[in-house]
């Protein structure tokens, strides 16, 4: 974990967008991607020839809706038959199938049918974020802090950590998004006296509320609440449904089964939603949306607010719950801090402001970047950064859900209550329920309900070999140990024999096994190698193409009249035309083929060009050596595509 392995980065792995930061020279840098954007879409696309991640994937989604995967965060750590997954599948153009109860995404890639775990898709986004950081820092990066919604449960956290491992990262820590944002806010403000801060984090797919007390670099989380399935995408869904109905009314046609039309509509809705945060009306103009029909319409802010009113109002429930859990009154909150792109919606701000009796909300930190900013600071601390502004920082986070075991009658007995500061270790003694009972089944649950059947089973194990004894005599000591990532280990010991059994909550609930992860790491390397090969191939093709066109235009240039013999000119032009037509028929050739064609073409052109140079006939700026410079460079030709 030393800094010898290069800098440590902080990654905000978002539902819709991700962001990466690094702490160096005493401050955090949020790193822009190759398109110059400081956030990158959490999208992965598969085509016949390549895999695209980030902006490139999102930009081609309308043409390739079935094979462009997003929202992996809404799948990760969940079961296929989870109601949330089933409801989401109605909105997704890509196919989700069940593999032993776990959801997998099915796509066509390079002409084959492939299926990926949500962890693998997330790992591809993480690899992209790592590469963005490496390009900026100019060195390899392996250590990272990754953030998750505070309300993520054990399986979702563990699956996110697995995604980091598949991406080849050493995950220093999984931290909660609102806590990371609070670090960003605390660093920004430099607080010395105690302040109670409420972080209201409404992103693309998740919603969290956390209350922290910040004093002198100590960040203590008092309570957390939220909804792992509420965010900007749900507002987009409402808009999409509204316009599908409008199209039906106006044109008597149903576009809901046409994936391309729906995707173009969704892109327009996302744009309109953003516009409505600053204007009172937004227009939607989509040419030839469906069966040649243009769709021109508009939506007012008031109508949008009415459409989403239940979702907007629903954001206040977790605020009330967090206040109750923290045993605070709203008057005791000093600062209400907005995080996440969806907090730009004026109605959301107004509801929150009214709830806090007209208090000004704090908008001083960038809502899109705050989480990555805080994660970068935490990464620096965990890798031993000694900068004065971070070395005294202490983070005390909490467990979002109660953890316990099932006792007689299906009762949930909590050992670690929700909002307990982590890491934490709790031990309790239990006994047998019947005479001469040879063993006990320890079933571990998370949740707040009184009966275990209403809570989430994390895993179970048996402690056997208990010596025969009347009921109530044996003493079985159960220990719950939750680490700083919020991940749980449970052990049980029979006091009379000293016999012990333990479990790290793993495979019972859809976690990937060690073998799965190792296989996925190898797959990830393989896909990366394929991506690199594809890039090199395109570079070779572009070199050949530009060399052929350059040569042809050079010898056909008016300035060359009288300087080049007709015979030489014909030789070059014919050979270039031949190459250009070969290229048109060999768009999917190998890198070696393109390089071979370039050599053959150079054999014809080079002697003629050299002769011209010696005669001083080559006009300046006419690039005979053009291809030599570009073939080593992986610059691609123009790749422009309609976005909607």
Swiss-Prot record:
Residues 627-638 have a biased composition (Polar residues). The gene is hsp70. It holds the Pfam family HSP70. GO terms for molecular function: ATP binding; ATP-dependent protein folding chaperone. PANTHER family: HEAT SHOCK PROTEIN 70KDA (PTHR19375). Residues 617-644 are annotated as: Disordered. Keywords: ATP-binding, Nucleotide-binding, Stress response. This is Heat shock 70 kDa protein. PROSITE patterns: HSP70_1, HSP70_2, HSP70_3. CDD domains: ASKHA_NBD_HSP70_HSPA1. GO terms for cellular component: cytoplasm; nucleus. Belongs to the heat shock protein 70 family. NCBIfam families: PRK00290.1.
């Amino acid at each position: 974990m030393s800094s010898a392995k290069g800098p440590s980065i902080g990654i905000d792995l978002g539902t819709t967008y991700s962001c990466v930061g690094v702490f160096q020279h005493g401050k955090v840098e949020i790193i822009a991607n190759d398109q110059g954007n400081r956030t990158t879409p959490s999208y992965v696309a598969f085509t016949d020839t390549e895999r695209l991640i980030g902006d490139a994937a999102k930009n081609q989604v309308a043409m390739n809706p079935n094979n462009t995967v997003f929202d992996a965060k809404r799948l990760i750590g969940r079961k296929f038959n989870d109601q949330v997954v089933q409801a989401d599948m109605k909105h997704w153009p890509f196919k989700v199938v069940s593999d032993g109860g776990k959801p997998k995404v099915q796509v066509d890639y390079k002409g084959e049918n492939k299926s990926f775990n949500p962890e693998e898709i997330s790992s591809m986004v993480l690899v992209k974020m790592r590469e963005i950081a490496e390009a900026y820092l100019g060195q390899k990066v392996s250590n990272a802090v990754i953030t998750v919604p505070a309300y993520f449960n054990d399986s979702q956290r563990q699956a996110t950590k697995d995604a980091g491992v598949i991406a080849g990262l050493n995950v220093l820590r999984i931290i909660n998004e609102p806590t990371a944002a609070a670090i960003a806010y605390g660093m920004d403000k430099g607080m010395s006296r105690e302040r109670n801060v409420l972080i209201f984090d409404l992103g693309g797919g998740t919603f969290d509320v956390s209350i922290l007390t910040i004093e002198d670099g100590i960040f203590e989380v008092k309570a957390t609440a939220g909804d792992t399935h509420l965010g900007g995408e749900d507002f987009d869904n409402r808009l999409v449904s509204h316009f599908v109905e409008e199209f039906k009314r106006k044109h008597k046609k149903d576009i809901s089964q046409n994936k391309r039309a729906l995707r173009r509509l969704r892109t327009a809705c996302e744009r309109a939603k953003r516009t409505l945060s600053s204007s009172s009306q937004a227009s939607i103009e989509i040419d030839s949306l469906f069966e040649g029909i243009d769709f021109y319409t508009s939506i007012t802010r008031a109508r949008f607010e009415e459409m989403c009113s239940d979702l907007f109002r629903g954001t206040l429930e977790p605020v009330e719950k967090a206040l109750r859990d923290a045993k605070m009154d709203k008057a005791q909150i000093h600062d209400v801090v907005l995080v996440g792109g969806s907090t730009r919606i004026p109605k959301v701000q107004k509801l929150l402001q009214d709830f806090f009796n007209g208090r000004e909300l704090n908008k001083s930190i960038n809502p899109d970047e705050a989480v990555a900013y805080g994660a970068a600071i935490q990464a620096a601390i965990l890798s031993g950064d000694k900068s004065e502004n971070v070395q005294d920082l202490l983070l005390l986070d909490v467990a979002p859900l109660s953890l316990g075991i099932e006792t007689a009658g299906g009762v949930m007995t909590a050992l670690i209550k929700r909002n307990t500061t982590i890491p934490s270790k709790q031990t309790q003694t239990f006994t047998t329920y019947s005479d001469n009972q040879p063993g006990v089944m320890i079933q571990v649950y998370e949740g707040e309900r009184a009966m275990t059947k209403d809570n989430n089973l994390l895993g179970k194990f048996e402690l056997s070999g208990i010596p025969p004894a009347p009921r109530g005599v044996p003493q079985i000591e159960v220990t719950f140990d939750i680490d700083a990532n919020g991940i749980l280990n449970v052990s049980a010991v029979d006091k009379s024999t000293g016999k012990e059994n333990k479990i790290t909550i793993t495979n019972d609930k859809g976690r990937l096994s060690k073998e799965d992860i190792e296989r996925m790491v190898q797959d990830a390397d393989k896909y990366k190698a394929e991506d690199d090969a594809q890039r090199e191939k395109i570079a070779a093709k572009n070199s050949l193409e530009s060399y052929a066109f350059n040569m042809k235009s050079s010898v056909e240039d008016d300035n060359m009249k009288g300087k080049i013999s007709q015979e030489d000119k014909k030789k070059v032009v014919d050979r270039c035309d031949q190459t250009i037509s070969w290229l048109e028929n060999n768009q999917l050739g190998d890198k070696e083929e393109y390089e071979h064609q370039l050599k053959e073409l150079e054999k014809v052109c080079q002697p003629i060009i050299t002769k011209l140079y010696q005669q001083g006939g080559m006009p300046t700026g006419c690039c005979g050596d053009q291809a030599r410079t570009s073939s080593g460079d992986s610059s691609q030709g123009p790749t422009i595509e309609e976005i909607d």
